[in-house]
Swiss-Prot record:
GO terms for cellular component: cytoplasm. This is Acetate kinase. Its main location: cytoplasm. Signal peptide: none annotated. The keyword Metal-binding applies. It comes from Helicobacter pylori (strain J99 / ATCC 700824) (Campylobacter pylori J99). It catalyses: acetate + ATP = acetyl phosphate + ADP. Keywords: ATP-binding, Cytoplasm, Kinase, Magnesium, Metal-binding, Nucleotide-binding, Transferase. Belongs to the acetokinase family.
């Protein structure tokens, strides 16, 4: 079985094609800067006998043109003979709202609902839908599966996902915590349970997906019971350009003091805050270099980021009562050893003790970073959201075939 995974952003298309016999990628790539003056198309073959790599700078007018280019080059490069041989297409859809708690086979009704949910994810859901619509028109016989970023967190109890606002706002406008990075949190939790030889339905963990966008999740008996992101990905941890948790009155105060519109203030909170807001840079590599040279702003940004993560670990330790593992994943979680070290520093009394030599040289695969005989295991796990989407799509297709 061959499954194509598509992840359409506001100006990009990421894709990965899998052979599901061995869960191995056949190809991966990216179309970026869509709609801009000059875009870029990258496609890499992962076949043993074919290690071709395509890199082209060209105009990519819209998502449909980008998808046509990907389709054309997958056959031209000899990765697949015919696009129609693909058994299913799995789509990452950011916002599933209250409607979608699991992967779903796409039909007209599902497409309408994804469109209706665009109000909660105006940058992402319309792009996700564009990919679905393209395939529906060009290859209507290929089953499409929508896998929602929010679905893993659908198991949160109401006391964790509700905001203490007038209840009618939830009833009318579905204002509540949804959480994101669900596909990543789900994937690494399953990998961790397998690695530690704990049945997944008995596994408890705190998962930290740390990157330019970051979130924490409390996982109890294999299910999400709380997460740091909220109605949107702005809430929670300090991120590359997002502020994370703040007093909501700050929005009104900035608008009054700086004479800004609501739209301008929200742009500041989403795109000019976080690490970038504190030290002028959201590249962790640059921040680390500056910090080591004694740069006060870089040091402050790093310390604020670490402190916020520690607060969430502490809160989720109380929520979960028993914790089997702390999981680090995402671009920073996987690659930023100094961040992992600082997050774990001083948590020994909670049963969390990092083995520094392993942390400094963790390799590229799943690794246990804990000192021997510690109560809670610290795991560094490379996430693979595309594979998780492919696995969920495969499961759906097999169910359809049985029916």
């Amino acid at each position: 079985m061959e499954i194509l995974v598509l992840n359409l952003g506001s100006s990009s298309i990421k894709f990965k094609l899998f052979d599901m016999k061995e869960n191995k990628p056949l190809a991966s790539g990216l179309a970026e800067k869509i709609g801009e003056e000059i875009g870029q198309l990258k496609i890499k073959s992962h076949l043993h006998h074919n290690d071709q790599e395509l890199k082209e700078k060209l105009v990519i007018k819209d998502h449909a043109i980008g998808l046509l280019m990907i389709r054309e080059n997958l056959t031209k490069m000899g990765i697949i003979k015919d696009f129609n041989q693909i058994d299913a297409i799995g789509h990452r859809v950011v916002q599933g709202g209250d409607k979608f708690h699991a992967p779903v086979l796409v039909d007209e009704k599902v497409m309408r609902e994804i469109g209706n949910l665009s109000i909660l994810a105006p940058l992402h859901n319309p792009a996700n839908l564009a990919g679905i619509e393209f395939v529906q028109k060009a290859h209507p016989h290929i089953p499409q599966i929508a896998v929602f970023d929010t679905a893993f967190h659908a198991s949160m109890p109401s006391y964790a996902y509700m905001y203490a606002l007038p209840y009618e706002l939830y009833e009318k406008y579905q204002i509540r915590r949804y959480g994101f990075h669900g596909t990543s949190h789900h994937y690494v939790a399953k990998e961790a349970a397998k690695f530690l030889n704990i049945p997944y339905e008995e596994f408890n963990a705190i998962s930290l997906h740390l990157g330019n966008g970051s979130s924490a999740a409390a996982i109890q008996n294999g299910k999400s019971v709380d997460t740091s992101m909220g109605l949107t990905p702005l809430e929670g941890l300090i991120m590359g350009t997002r502020c994370g948790d703040i007093d909501p009155t700050v929005v009104e105060y900035i608008a009054q003091c700086a004479n800004k519109s609501l739209e301008e203030v929200m742009k500041i909170l989403n795109h000019e805050s976080g690490l970038k807001g504190i030290c002028g840079d959201n590249d962790a590599r640059n921040i680390e270099v500056r910090k080591e040279k004694g740069d006060k702003q870089a040091k402050l940004a790093f310390e604020m980021c670490v402190y916020r993560i520690k607060k969430y670990i502490g809160a989720y330790m109380v929520v979960l009562k028993k914790v089997d593992a702390i999981i680090f994943t995402g671009g920073l979680g996987e690659n930023y050893s100094a961040l992992r070290e600082s997050v774990c520093e001083g948590l020994e009394n909670l049963g969390i003790a990092l083995h520094k030599p392993t942390n400094d040289n963790p390799g590229s695969a799943l690794v246990n970073l804990s000192q021997p005989n510690t109560k809670i295991q610290i795991l560094r796990i490379p996430t693979d959201e595309e594979l998780e989407i492919a696995l969920q799509a495969k499961e759906m297709v097999e169910k359809i075939k049985v029916v």
